[in-house]
Swiss-Prot record:
Name the UniProt record assigns to this protein: Nucleotide-binding protein PSHAa2554
Described purpose of this protein according to its UniProt entry: Displays ATPase and GTPase activities.
GO molecular function: ATP binding; GTP binding
Gene3D superfamilies, alphabetized: P-loop containing nucleotide triphosphate hydrolases
Residues binding ATP: G8, R9, S10, G11, S12, G13, K14, S15
Length: 281
């Protein structure tokens, strides 16, 4: 079992880091008391093989040995990896000023700057055990997310799930579409008697559409658009991208385009799905 423990000073980005890990398929628990960690792992081990927890300063043992003892109580099948997030004091003060949130140690009537310094002292129990220390002082939310993914997955690029979906405008635009392309201006096989009962998956329709230069150009332009902006979308903390291509009824032109372009991208991207909405009815 993979067990990720996320901790660090308040305001350093623990919540962002936990959301990233959750998007990677981990079962996540926020702000769990450390002494409950072994029990949690045992109770969910039958259903989950990837767990992540966040720990803040209020849920820590008082000394290093106590923390080590708790980790020793973990079952042998759990392999913990500890991420420690931190920022410099001035950055943390600025972030708290911007969000107007109360620091967890301010309940002791400590001024913010002293609460931040005291928190650092209390968290020393974790720093010495950290497998990865991430300084978020100069990182944006997206950069922190990318750093977490890179460390966990062992590679920089997140594998986006790309769906190419055909549809008919007369049945409505797909609600989950990120980009919509209108193919209704292209030559329509519907008006060819021998092609009318077929779909864009049938070879005669493919041959008919591929023979028109305007179809070839439109196909190329959609491919180029997606290929150009895909790296930026992958870095933007996305999990899914849906490219919807529509024609009048969702039978010929849009089906041909979604299938052709989807197959092209599937040759170089591992997570490509092709869906023909109207053909599923």
């Amino acid at each position: 079992m993979e067990l990720i423990i996320i901790s660090g000073r308040s305001g350093s980005g623990k919540s962002v880091a936990l959301r990233v890990v959750e998007d990677l398929g981990y079962y996540c628990v926020d702000n769990i008391p450390v002494n409950l960690l072994p029990s949690l792992v045992r109770s969910v081990s039958d259903n989950y093989d990837k767990i992540a927890v966040s720990i803040d300063v209020r849920n820590l043992p008082k000394d290093q040995q106590q923390f080590n003892d708790i980790l020793e109580y973990l079952p042998d099948f759990a392999k913990p990896t500890l991420f420690y997030l931190d920022s410099d004091d001035q950055t943390l003060i600025r972030r708290y000023s911007e969000t107007r949130r109360l620091h967890p140690l301010s309940i002791d009537s400590l001024p913010l700057d002293l609460a931040i310094k005291k928190e650092k002292e209390l968290l020393d129990v974790l720093v010495t055990r950290a497998d990865h220390v991430i300084d978020t002082t100069d990182l944006s939310v997206h950069q922190l997310a990318e750093s977490m993914r890179e460390t966990i997955l062992g590679k920089k690029d997140k594998q986006l799930i790309i769906t190419f979906e055909s549809f008919g405008f007369k049945h409505g635009i797909p609600k989950g579409a990120d980009y919509v392309f209108d193919a209704r201006f292209l030559p329509n096989p519907h008006w060819e008697p021998e092609l009318k009962p077929l779909t864009g998956l049938d070879q005669p329709v493919k041959d008919y559409l591929a023979s028109h230069s305007i179809v070839q150009k439109f196909t190329w332009q959609i491919q180029t658009f997606v290929q150009t902006w895909l790296p930026h979308l992958e870095r933007n903390n996305r999990s899914y991208l849906t490219i919807a291509i529509g024609c009048t009824g969702g039978q010929h032109r849009s089906v041909y385009l979604a299938q052709t372009i989807g197959e092209s991208f599937a040759m170089s991207h591992p997570n490509v799905k092709i869906r023909h909405r109207e053909q599923e009815k």
